[in-house]
Amino acid sequence: MKKLGLILIIIALFAFSPEKIKTKGIALIEYNAKFNESNAYSDIKRVKDVKVISLWIDDDASLKSDEGIRSVPTMILYKNGKEVKRWEAGLSMSLDVPYIEIQKEVDKLTGANKF
């Protein structure tokens, strides 16, 4: 029984590890906290050609330290598991970046709009 408990703990520890979050290809991850849910980035659904993931740092405290999250929301664009670009909230605790700026960064990575 102790072995089963230990196995479940190990699985839980690795279930949300940053290596699992970072997928192959291009991913846009919004890190936020439940106390700041009202300031979630509403335009995230408008960004195209990217896998979009929203995560609560309250659910996995290691996300904050592993990803260097200093304020919420924070949006990080990854390519093949490597951080490419980061947008962080200011004192207002909201992300004031036009979605088109994020889309342009995604387009650079996907090669969209190239002739």
Language-model regions: role of each:
Residues P18-I53:
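Local sequence-structure signature of Cys/Sec-based thiol-disulfide redox active-site neighborhoods
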Residues I57-S65:
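N-terminal post-signal-peptidase region of extra-cytosolic proteins
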Residues M1-K2:
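N-terminal hydrophobic targeting signals that begin at the initiator methionine
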Residues E67-K79:
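Structural micro-motif
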Residues Y31-A33, I57-D58, G90:
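Active-site-proximal beta-strand/loop segments in catalytic clefts of secreted hydrolases
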Residues L77-F115:
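Non-catalytic, surface beta->alpha helical segment in thiol-disulfide oxidoreductase systems
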Residues L6-S17:
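Hydrophobic h-region of N-terminal signal peptides that target proteins for export
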